[in-house]
Amino acid sequence: MKILYAASEATPFAKSGGLADVAGSLPKALVKDGVDARVIMPLYGDLKFRDKLEYVTNYSVPVGWRSQYCGLFKAEVNGVTYYFLDNEYYFKRRGLYGFYDDGERFAFFSRAVLETLFYIDFTPDIINCNDWQTALVPVYLNLYYRHLDKFNRIKTIFTIHNIAYQGKYGTEILEDTCGIGRRDQHIVEYDGCANFMKGAIETADKITTVSPTYAQEILDPWFSYGLDALLREKQYKLCGILNGIDMEANNPATDPHIAFNYDVNNFEEGKAKCKEALQDKFGLNKDGSPVFAMVSRMVGMKGFDLVQSVADGLVDRGIELVILGSGESQYENFFSDLCGRHPGRVGTYIGFEPALSQEIYAGADAFIMPSKSEPCGLAQMVACRYGTPPIIRETGGLRDSIHDCTLGEGNGFTFAGYSAHELYDACCRAQDRYYSKEDWNNLIRYDMECDFSWDVSAKSYEGLYNETANLW
């Protein structure tokens, strides 16, 4: 089985969000299992390890009525071949996204992915495209390449990581930049504009999301950002596969950033020392109170409005809070002020430091994640890996990965409704369980033994790839 994984970012080369972690981890797990999986992505100006890349060739790529240069480079990391598409006009910039011509940049990239196959000794069975930045790949394949022998058996899978970002532009981009004539523009047009994601949903052989629950949620108007009717029509080719985490990178037994390394056999000593170090760093009291933490962007979608409503009540109940993140000023200001109102009980760091986030995962007693919507979420899995039971709202991948321990065997505390009252109740249940040492230690042990590795997810993807490759 040959897989070409097309993504706009991938670790360790370029990252702005969770897509990079998936693109860096899933192909590695597939290769480990004997699949010939390769990654193709843009060669950004601030790409890491640029000096390690090997030049392959260059060629022209159609962009509407004109052609643009494309240079091809490659590298191999962890047994995975990475291809990098170079065009300084489009990609030699500071940052990955947020430019006025993003539509043109990624229309070029999508077309270049297919053109590249003429110049490498690799014809994939499946091209797995990811989010709107690669959404035109299946559109272009069906319109301009399907009749060629090299392409007529290639199948496409489109993975939706976050349906909120669809790649919407004025319809004038379709002919001038994408080169799609009026006869075919209906494939990409939606609600009066060009919608790249809509084009992929129409033309890809299969559609996946990053969790089974999210695959069901996006059929509902509340979650779909306008695409629910189309997705219900295409539901026969939609499924959800839960993402995994890198179990090697997130390992409390070897993590160099935490105060004391531990595993499932000595977590009591290890977490106690990590908690003490965390309390020292944030100036918190060491009076036996549980420490509940959040590591997140400070935006409403992550449930910060709920946390804002219950924070004072949780502190008054004897819970210490640690918050790491940045985002909307109303939340940054609130949690900064919260420290002043509750000295020794609340610690806030505005910004993001990867090493500090690992210290929090290891040192906190519980991890709060009350998202309004969460396609998959990785933080709750990392928290389990470090023996820090999550408190989550039942949505998307949170619902698929965390199950309430008060209902029997589970690895955290959950609530269903998007309300401050339900979040407060879940936190109180976690606090009550914390003071029952034997029950709490059993929960930590259960969490640390959960298998959220990419090996599990890769098996599901392999099944999907085999099913898709056998479609007529």
Would you name each region that the model predicts?
Residues 1-472:
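Catalytic cores of nucleotide-sugar-dependent glycosyltransferases that transfer UDP/GDP/TDP-activated
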